[in-house]
Amino acid sequence: YGDATGQARHSSSNVTNWEIVKNTLADYRITNKVPRSNPAERDRVNAVNGMLCNARGDRRFLINPKCKHLIRDCEQVAFKEGSTQIDKKDTNLTHASDASGYMIEQEFSLIRNEYKGLKI
């Protein structure tokens, strides 16, 4: 699971970030689950919040207490004032929550399958 922007080529490199990851893990049975484009940030946040605790009080995503970075992100990441965009000014935050959010949004999306580009 990952950020679709990692598939972009940069003028400073002949390979994408995801090609580097794929080549590094070539000897392992890893399934690459990177979408062609990222989901809307709000959709991803809603999917994560729904897994952490939905309207019925169900908790379907539990975080191991050893996951200090993810816990810190969940406690401190917030939207920009008056916006639906995540505030990313602190470069030490959002990496762990973004990563878990990509997985949750793909596997437990609140949006129908046709949004995700699956052929039915």
Question: What do the PLM-derived regions correspond to, one by one?
Answer:
Residues 90-111:
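Acidic, Mg2+-coordinating catalytic module of metal-dependent nucleases/exonucleases
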Residues 1-87, 110-111, 117-120:
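Mg2+-dependent endonuclease catalytic cores in nucleic-acid-processing enzymes, primarily RNase H-like
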